From Swiss-Prot:
Subunit structure: Component of the eukaryotic translation initiation factor 3 (eIF-3) complex.
GO biological process: cap-dependent translational initiation; formation of cytoplasmic translation initiation complex
Gene source species: Coccidioides immitis (strain RS) (Valley fever fungus)
Origin organism lineage: Eukaryota, Fungi, Dikarya, Ascomycota, Pezizomycotina
Protein name in UniProt: Eukaryotic translation initiation factor 3 subunit D
Ranges where the record places region RNA gate: 304-318
HAMAP family: eIF3d
Length: 598
């Protein structure tokens, strides 16, 4: 076969009329009907709309992804919005309803609104005769505002929003005041942050009972039953003599110190605050007195450590009233809520026992603070157990032991064994679950028994330090049962009337596990403070100071109001004694006025 030439190949190509490919003209009729080969909803004149949101920038989620997977430029995708009409917002019918709450200025608890309870400290004791905790706050006869200084002061801010700037997350959003004014003559010796406190650990054996004082009534089991709707019991105010004397003014502790039964002395309410220090938010202070080789953990009169805080650990804790709202004497400020909760706890422990002289448990000795010749009110059900704990280590040359005055509120018969069980009575209070500072709490009236676990879990979150202190006090006293009462306001806008919605019982050790409370960590904190105070004395001796057995040194441990640190200050030996004398004089004047009015 002869080879093909280029001319033969070109001549074999089809002619120009029969060129390869689709025909150039396209028909615009389909069965005689004209049509346009595009959708009316598509935007003409552009290849793509780059201003529209793509599928990647629209809302996430599988349903949204499946619904919006196709882009807007897909053929026919714009038909849905072809005839859409943009309706303008009609604001002619818009109106604002004034729903601001105004609290009516009401008379506070006791005389003048500022009294918690009439101070009934130890009378005729060896040292300071008065030491009752239920006394008049610093506000005196002026009203409830006196207790507010122990908590965050945010007056003047109002409802204005904040502008957050650089590193605002690391700054305290609420400036609170210290529980005690730091004086210029005080010298700071040590500063310990909470991260260091939380790492301390000291395994301590169970304590031993040294002596018991007082008596106990039996707990009323009817409060354990779920109340029928609209039949809740009203919390009553009972006039009973109750005492919360500081450590150094306790005559029993003074006697034990003279016998050298231990080297460290404290009360359960003071010690529980120290053991749960890393959970606290508000400021508090503890006075430490070193008398020779003895250490006393004391508290000031009218100190914040005696008040029961409310929602201290909530993410949005209760706020102080602004300058405009302060005129209405708001009842939901931290100080007012703490005063209300303290009174509720006092009355709840008195009301939930059956007062019967024929059915009560007498301890070995009578109440050491009650004087029948001076008191006109009957004595409240209270048992004081003085217990000793060993905090010694193997390296210690001398044993380190602490004596703690613990408290029991009632006694309960065991249903199986019939033995008497010691009971600790405490009360949680609800002020308004819709108000600011409620911490997302549920409505107790409708959810307490249907969602008990959720209610208790919320309280553990909002009142972590308060529940931890109560549990620590129950464990220190070796209580068998801890009863938690749930008390709410009869009217959310009034703090004068309360209803008991129910009572739930727990074993203290089990409740401590639920809230991750480690007693070994608490004992480690106590031992650290004891070693720190002893080391300061040793340092003074090395510097040449005269060491006298009867020399008194005083320190104060203060929790910073805005930071998670505690500071130890050295203060003069006569610090706070002038305040005690002034308070005693004011109390005498008040009692004389009451007699004149009668």
């Amino acid at each position: 076969m002869a080879p093909l030439s280029l001319t033969d190949i070109v001549s074999a190509l089809p002619s120009e009329e029969d060129a390869w490919g689709p025909p150039v003209p396209t028909g615009n009729h389909l069965d005689g009907v004209p049509y346009a080969p595009f959708s009316k909803g598509d935007k003409l004149g552009r290849m793509a709309d780059w201003g529209a949101d793509s599928k990647d920038s629209r809302e996430r989620g599988r349903q949204a992804y499946n619904r919006n997977y196709r882009d807007q430029q897909v053929y026919g995708a714009g038909t849905s919005s072809l005839f859409a009409v943009q309706v303008a917002e009609d604001e002619s019918s818009f109106s604002v309803v004034d729903n601001t709450r105004t609290s009516v200025k009401t008379r506070g608890f006791g005389r003048g609104g500022g009294t918690i309870f009439r101070g009934r400290g130890q009378r005729g004791g060896a040292q300071r005769g008065r030491g009752g905790a239920f006394q008049r706050p610093a506000g005196g006869r002026g009203g409830q505002a006196g207790g507010d200084r122990y908590y965050d002061q945010r007056g003047g801010r109002g409802n204005r929003g904040r502008r957050f700037g650089w590193k605002d997350y690391d700054k305290p959003q609420r400036n609170r005041d210290s529980s005690v004014a730091i004086r210029p003559e005080w010298s700071m010796l040590e500063e310990i942050d909470f991260s260091r406190l939380s790492k301390l650990n000291l395994e301590t054996p169970d304590g031993e009972d040294l002596d018991n004082y007082g008596f106990l009534y039996y707990y009323d089991r009817s409060y354990d039953k779920a109340p029928v709707k609209n039949t809740e019991r009203r919390l009553r105010a009972l006039e009973r003599a109750a005492y919360n004397v500081t450590t150094s003014a306790d005559p029993v502790i003074q006697e034990l110190a003279e016998k050298d039964e231990a080297t460290v002395f404290a009360t359960a309410d003071i010690l529980s605050m120290l053991m749960c220090a890393s959970r606290s938010v508000y400021s508090w202070d503890i006075v430490i007195v070193k008398h020779g080789n003895k250490i006393y953990f004391d508290k000031r009169d009218n100190a914040s450590i005696d008040l029961v805080t409310v929602n201290e650990n909530a993410a949005d804790a209760p706020m102080e009233a602004s300058e405009g709202q302060a005129k209405h004497d708001s009842i939901n400020t931290p100080g007012a809520l703490a005063l209300e909760a303290t009174i509720i706890n006092h009355n709840f422990a008195l009301q939930t026992v059956v007062e019967s002289d024929s059915a009560k448990v007498e301890f070995s000795h009578p109440n050491p603070f009650y004087n029948p010749s001076e008191e006109t009110e009957p004595l409240a059900s209270k048992g004081f157990k003085y217990r000793r704990f060993d905090l010694s280590l193997e390296k210690d040359e001398e044993p380190v032991q602490i004596i703690v005055r613990t408290e029991i509120d009632a006694v309960l018969k065991n249903n199986i064994s019939g033995e008497d069980q010691h009971v600790t009575l405490k009360a949680l209070n609800e002020f308004d679950h819709k108000a600011q500072g409620a911490g997302g709490a549920l409505d107790w009236r409708s959810k307490l028994y249907s969602q008990r676990g959720a209610v208790v879990a919320t309280e553990m979150k909002n009142n972590n330090v308060k529940l931890a202190r109560w549990t620590t006090q129950a464990i220190l006293a070796k209580s068998d049962v801890m009863k938690l009462g749930f008390v709410t306001r009869a009217n959310p806008r009034s703090a004068t009337a309360h209803m008991i919605l129910g009572v739930i019982g727990y074993k203290p050790r089990e409740f401590a596990l639920q809230m991750n409370l480690n007693m070994a960590n608490g004992w480690g904190i106590v031992r650290t403070i004891i070693d720190l105070v002893n080391s300061l004395d040793a340092r003074d001796e090395e510097e040449g100071d005269d060491a006298q057995e009867d020399k008194i040194k005083k320190y104060i441990l203060v929790k910073d109001p805005n930071k998670s640190v505690v500071r130890l200050y050295s203060v003069p030996a006569n610090t706070f004694e002038e305040e005690d004398d002034t308070g005693a004089k004011a109390e005498k004047d008040e009692e004389s006025e009451e007699k004149d009015e009668e």
